[in-house]
UniProtKB/Swiss-Prot annotation:
It comes from Cupriavidus pinatubonensis (strain JMP 134 / LMG 1197). InterPro entries: aa-tRNA-synth_II (IPR006195), aa-tRNA-synth_II/BPL/LPL (IPR045864), Anticodon-bd (IPR004154), Anticodon-bd_dom_sf (IPR036621), His-tRNA-ligase (IPR015807), HisRS-like_core (IPR041715), HisRS/HisZ (IPR004516), HisRS_anticodon (IPR033656). Disulfide bonds: none annotated. Keywords: Aminoacyl-tRNA synthetase, ATP-binding, Cytoplasm, Ligase, Nucleotide-binding, Protein biosynthesis. Its EC number is 6.1.1.21. GO terms for cellular component: cytoplasm. Residues 1-11 have a biased composition (Polar residues). The gene is hisS. Pfam families: HGTP_anticodon (PF03129), tRNA-synt_His (PF13393). This is Histidine--tRNA ligase.
Amino acid sequence: MTQNENPSAQSGAKPEDKARPAKALQGVKGMNDMLPADAPLWEHFENAARAMLRAYGYQQIRTPIVEHTQLFVRGIGEVTDIVEKEMYSFTDALNGEQLTLRPEGTAAAVRATIEHNLLYDGPKRLWYTGPMFRHERPQRGRYRQFHQLGAEALGFAGPDVDAEIILMCQRLWDDLGLTGVRLEINSLGQAHERAAHREELIKYLEGFKDILDEDGKRRLYTNPLRVLDTKNPALQEMAANAPKLIDFLGEESLAHFEGVQRLLKANNIPYKINPRLVRGLDYYNLTVFEWITDKLGAQGTIAGGGRYDPLIAQMGGKAAPACGWAMGIERIIELIREEGVVPDAVGCDVYLVHQGEAAQQQATVAAERLRDAGLDVVLHATPDGKSGSFKSQMKRADASGAAYAVIIGEDEVAAGVVQVKELRQGAQAEGGGQQAQVPAENLVDYLIDAMVGASE
């Protein structure tokens, strides 16, 4: 190529193409980022949830995001909406296995319990949290990736534990300051009772074939209970007059349900019996429940659960009773916002302001010593690597939410001192909010004493 030849001209590329910035990539629709501004609300929820779970003696379990597809087909039910049309499934290119991004947490928790023989020494109370995935149209309160908190009480058969898992939710609502969340409960009885009801229900629904929507027709013979869970306004009267499962329950199932209600009443938990409440998963029996709010529109269910005694044996484990709940964290975060609950602002303890190379070095050492003492410290830094003026740095310090600013310049380095300035109301540095000069070697003790004074 000669010196005058233009390689871009030979390739057909236009010179201006090289200067065109790359198109910014976007996240997947329905899979949302949690940004720093959202973090205080999430931390507020997570801290309250962990404290509540600890109060009831639940231990955390963590399972993989990806499981074998068959786990959910067998665990959730082959004719459920989740398995039929909402799962993110794929074939593993390495070995041809059918795998799925988990759409819910109970099946995986039960799988882990069986695989690791967790019930060998008695019942267990477990909890989990993490992202779940469902392939559906994103809308308010319903996302393709969402976060779930769940609790599972494994190996307990009595209505006392059914009541306990409901009380856990109520305690969390109280701790979060949520109001207007109502409880609906029902009993699905046992398999033979549901079979007798199913026979009568199918006969009843066959008389309405002409008005059933597509979902109703599809479920009529595979999962008729779910037909009653319709949101179609045109089918509400039909659903309301359908044979009620509770009328088919035997003495044992009724006694269990009455036991749950008795304990809820004893704890002053108001509830409504909803005979059409069936939940969307096939593994439930006996008690089912939902916590509902009117403040989130159509997606008003913020938590739900119940008893699933057959599931452990159904998934290959030794038969054991079980019950639990799950709640959608994004919906609860939105409800916290609707309620106007404002968590305490989270700021650092100290913001370190510095100017000059020697001051930067001393500030770095001071920051590490303060962190060694357990303080949260932000060391000033800028995109261009220059420290900036003291005035601009102090603006950053104010905005950080720090209780104190520690200021180090060339004069301070030469004198072996630092300046400590109170930034936030309630900080108790000597001088009552004024700026104090402190020997550099005494900085840690000075700030710890000041912060102890602020907390008294």
